[in-house]
Amino acid sequence: MVTMTTLRASCCRLTGRTAAGRERGSSSIQMVILMPALFSIMFLGMQGALYYHARTVAIAAAQEGARAAGSQNGTAGDGISAASSFVSDAGGKDVLPGAHMTGSRSATTATVTVTGTSLSVIPGWSLAVSQSASVPVERITR
């Protein structure tokens, strides 16, 4: 004789089997959805690091160039040369591709600007970097 307990037990066994069967392949679908998101986050993090490194190199080169241009016998050309030398020593095109330096010197201030782009790990996305530094011109006082 079939009792209510045996019906309930067989029903739970059947639904347990079918529920487990419906979960088959779910980890593959989760990976298809999650892996591109994880890679995107990873590449954005690397892109941010490359941008800030290029920005740091640009400001350091601009400061170096401004110090050279602001020295007592310095010229704007000396500042541009010092900034260019700094960028090439820091990695050149591997750090700041398309680096361009401009400089000016007045009676009181020397300014050097370094512009370029950061390296890109995301295709079609290049970030411009522009940093400027100004220093007072050294002069002899008596």
List each language-model region with its residue ranges.
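Short, conserved structural patches
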Residues: 2-12, 76-142
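Alpha-helical assembly-interface signal, strongest on the long, hydrophobic N-terminal helix that forms
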Residues: 2-82
